[in-house]
């Protein structure tokens, strides 16, 4: 609303007149005299709109004309403002509210190497019967004062941090070698997150000295969060000490599939995630699940001869030991190759065993956030091939991570894709939906696997109470006594794990004691 001031003069008998022009001096007849009123042109909002439009257009001369008492360096101040922020564009618009106490808010949107938006304020005053901007450096930005300037400064960004589950940074030179292997794997899977970047910050400066960073210094790149548990990792690394053959250990949280530890010794090749090995008798967890689903009960009597011809090929137990007739649970605990080979031919077919293997993740791409291989179960070609597959030999291949997830499935009741990296878009990542196992199968295996530790092939190993597992001796190569990889997989509570020693021999003698050291360190 236009403002007015005036005085009342004594009554005179003269004709009122109107001065129409810039001054707008208006006579107003009132009782007892005439009020001579001076009206201010326009409104604060109109002046603000003209000023902000000129600022957007970089028309500093027009802006100066709308300012009450503009300083000598007015135009230069605005050019320095634009240059300091390295702007490629800027818009200034009045906000929705009208003037209040002579102040009008405006919205600034600056475009440059780092965009900036803020709300500024114009203070309007009456000067020479019109509305003018009362200008100070704070008119350009609320935090500007005499002697201060705004600058956009570009610098190298800090490398992205990789964090363990507890927030500890793990991508530094002091990190264990196995953890560094995982970091290198993440660089392959998430190259954009590790690329060298430059970061622009906007700050207040006094001369060349920074006073305050306004934006762009929010702690750098968002860190990469992992599921690694450093306590579990240290226990695994300690358990592997002194092993004179290549050895790997993987630990998972069974209920979620979270990878807690991946340890390889020596370093170089990440065999825990990328190695493909015959799983040997650890695969009997899968075969036993198929047999139980087909009607076999843990207490059912079965034959376990020392040697059995299946499809024209001789299968034998470790040391050709003959157990005669025993329960299915005992056959599992003592790892009877002849029992599982013959029963797979008599009661299963390749398609059915393959179906159950797939329910444990075989054939499923593994995308935990670092490169990892999938477990392989090719369709058996004949009875001999099926019997070999049933005991984890032949063409069946798996990594320690794959077999740890098999143990985790029994512990939790569902196979869950393992994962290491949280909150990132992993290329080709499969849905993390758990695949529930049959309840009867889970219940049976939860009696079979503890029996391995209490009464079977691992009964001489000092495991902590509550451990369930399966030994494996996976032959490879050729000859009458071919070399073998040593395996042990298992779980205790919500912790599932696997251990492999390349060329280590019997799982009960080599891999199982390593697993026991690992679990005892956590107990």
Regions flagged by a language model, labelled:
Residues 1-17, 25-28:
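Terminal targeting segments of Actinobacterial cell-envelope proteins
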Residues 17-26, 30-55, 60, 415, ...:
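C-terminal region of N-terminal signal peptides and the immediate post-cleavage residues
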Residues 39-46, 50, 55-103:
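Short solvent-exposed beta->alpha transition segments
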Residues 159, 274-283:
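Gly/Ser-rich catalytic serine loop of serine hydrolases
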Residues 247-275, 290, 294-507:
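Beta-lactam-recognizing serine transpeptidase/beta-lactamase-like catalytic domain environment
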Residues 281, 285-288, 307:
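Acidic, glycine-rich loop-and-beta core segments that form the ion-binding/anion-interacting portion
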Residues 45-53, 61, 65, 168, ...:
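Solvent-exposed, polar/charged alpha-helical surfaces in well-ordered, non-transmembrane soluble domains
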Residues 18, 83-248, 256, 485:
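Extracytoplasmic/periplasmic proteins that interact with beta-lactams or build/remodel peptidoglycan
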């Amino acid at each position: 609303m236009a403002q007015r001031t005036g005085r009342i003069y004594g009554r005179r008998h003269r004709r009122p007149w109107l001065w129409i022009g810039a001054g707008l001096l208006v006579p107003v007849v009132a009782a007892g005299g005439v009020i001579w009123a001076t009206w201010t042109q326009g409104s604060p909002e109109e002046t603000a709109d003209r000023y902000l439009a000129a600022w957007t257009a970089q028309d500093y001369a027009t802006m100066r004309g709308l300012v009450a008492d503009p300083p000598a360096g007015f135009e230069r101040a605005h050019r320095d403002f634009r240059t300091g922020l390295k702007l490629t564009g800027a818009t200034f618009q009045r906000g929705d509210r009208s003037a209040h106490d002579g102040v009008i808010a405006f919205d600034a949107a600056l475009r440059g190497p780092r965009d900036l938006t803020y709300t500024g304020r114009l203070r309007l005053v009456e000067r020479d019967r019109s509305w003018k901007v009362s200008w100070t450096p704070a008119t350009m930005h609320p935090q500007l004062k005499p002697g201060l300037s705004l600058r956009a400064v570009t610098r190298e960004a800090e490398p992205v941090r990789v964090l363990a589950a507890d927030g500890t940074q793990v991508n530094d030179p002091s990190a264990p070698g196995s953890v560094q292997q995982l970091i290198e794997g993440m660089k392959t899977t998430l190259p954009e997150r590790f690329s060298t970047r430059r970061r622009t910050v906007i700050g207040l400066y006094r001369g060349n000295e920074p006073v305050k960073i306004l934006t762009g210094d929010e702690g750098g790149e968002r860190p990469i969060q992992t599921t690694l548990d450093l306590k579990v990792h240290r226990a695994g690394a300690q358990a592997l000490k002194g092993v004179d053959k290549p050895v790997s250990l993987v630990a998972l949280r069974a209920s979620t599939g979270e990878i807690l530890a991946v340890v390889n010794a020596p370093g170089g090749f990440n065999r825990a995630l990328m190695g493909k090995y015959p799983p040997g008798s650890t695969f009997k967890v899968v075969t036993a699940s198929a047999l139980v689903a087909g009607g076999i009960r843990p207490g059912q009597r079965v034959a376990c001869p020392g040697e059995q011809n299946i499809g024209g090929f001789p299968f034998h137990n470790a040391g050709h030991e003959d157990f005669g007739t025993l329960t299915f649970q005992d056959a599992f605990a003592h790892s009877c190759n002849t029992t599982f080979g013959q029963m797979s031919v008599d009661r299963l077919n390749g398609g059915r065993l393959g179906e159950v293997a797939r329910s444990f993740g075989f054939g499923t791409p593994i995308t935990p956030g670092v490169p990892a291989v999938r477990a392989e179960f090719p369709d058996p070609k004949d009875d001999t091939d099926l019997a070999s597959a049933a005991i984890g030999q032949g063409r069946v291949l798996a990594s320690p991570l794959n077999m740890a997830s098999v143990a985790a499935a029994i512990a939790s009741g569902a196979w869950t894709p393992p994962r290491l990296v949280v909150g990132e878009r992993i290329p080709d990542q499969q849905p993390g939906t758990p695949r529930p196992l049959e309840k009867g199968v889970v219940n049976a295996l939860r009696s079979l696997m503890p029996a391995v530790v209490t009464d079977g092939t691992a009964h001489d190993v000092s495991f902590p109470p509550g451990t369930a597992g399966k030994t494996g001796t996976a032959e490879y190569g050729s000859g009458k006594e071919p070399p073998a990889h040593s395996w042990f997989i298992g779980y205790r509570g919500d912790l599932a794990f696997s251990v492999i020693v390349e060329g280590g021999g019997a799982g009960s003698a080599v891999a199982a004691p390593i697993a026991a050291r690992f679990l005892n360190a956590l107990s």
